[in-house]
A protein has these predicted regions:
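Bacterial N-terminal signal peptides that target proteins for export
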Residues: 1-9
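N-terminal secretory signal peptides
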Residues: 26-77
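Intrinsically disordered, low-complexity prosegments and terminal tails associated
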Residues: 15, 43-50, 157, 161-162, ...
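Short, charged/polar surface micro-motifs in flexible loops or helix N-caps
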Residues: 77-84
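Bacterial signal peptide processing site
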Residues: 21-25
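C-terminal motif of bacterial Sec signal peptides marking the signal peptidase cleavage site
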Residues: 16-20
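Extracytosolic low-complexity repeat regions of secreted or lipid-anchored proteins
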Residues: 84-167
Length: 167
C-alpha cells in the first residue's frame, strides 16, 4: 500500500514539474474575446501546426504555437473596414494580409464577425499552411461578407501583389 502511495505521489510530482516547465505565452485578449463564438473557435484549434505544438496562453480566446511562438491567434476583434491591403481566400475563409512587418505577417479575417487575427513568423512556417490549418476552426465565425475577388488559386500569401483588395 505504501509503495502504491509513493508511486502515485511521485507520478503527480513529475506531472507537476513537467507542466510547470511548459511555457505560457502572454497575450492581450481582443475587445470581444468573451463572445461565445470565440469559444467555438478555440475548442476547435489544432494541437499543432506543422512542427509547432500548441502552447498555453494567459488570455481568453487566444492561442499560440511553437517555442518560441511562431503563430499567435486572437479572436474577438472588431471586423476590419474595407482596405486596399491584399485579400486571399484559403480554406473557405477570406483573410486580409498585412505585410508591414515582414517576415512577420498579420492576417485578419474579412467578412467574419467577430474577427480573428493571426500573426505568423514566416521564417518558421508558411502563412498558407497556417491559414489552412486554422480554417476549420475559423469557419465557426459567421460569414457576414467577403472580399470582392480574393486570390484563391495557389495563393502564396507572402509577396503576392496580384491579389485583390477587400471591398
Amino acid at each position: 500500500v505504501k509503495l502504491k502511495i509513493l508511486t502515485s505521489v511521485a507520478a503527480l510530482c513529475a506531472l507537476f514539474l513537467l507542466s510547470s516547465c511548459a511555457p505560457t505565452v502572454h497575450l492581450e485578449p481582443a475587445a470581444n474575446a468573451n463572445d461565445p463564438l470565440c469559444a467555438e473557435v478555440t475548442v476547435r484549434l489544432p494541437d499543432s501546426i506543422g512542427d509547432q505544438d500548441r502552447v498555453w496562453t494567459d488570455a481568453q480566446a487566444t492561442a499560440a504555437w511553437g517555442t518560441p511562438s511562431s503563430v499567435l491567434l486572437t479572436c474577438g476583434s472588431e471586423p476590419p473596414a474595407p482596405t486596399t491591403l491584399q485579400c486571399v481566400s484559403l480554406g473557405g475563409v477570406d483573410w486580409i494580409v498585412d505585410e508591414e512587418d515582414t517576415p512577420n505577417l498579420r492576417l485578419t479575417t474579412y467578412g467574419r464577425e467577430p474577427a480573428a487575427q493571426v500573426y505568423v513568423d514566416t521564417t518558421t512556417l508558411s502563412a498558407d499552411a497556417v491559414l489552412e490549418s486554422l480554417a476549420g476552426a475559423i469557419q465557426q465565425l459567421p460569414k457576414t461578407g467577403e472580399c470582392t475577388a480574393p486570390v484563391t488559386e495557389d495563393p502564396d500569401v507572402v509577396g503576392d501583389e496580384t491579389g485583390d483588395t477587400a471591398p
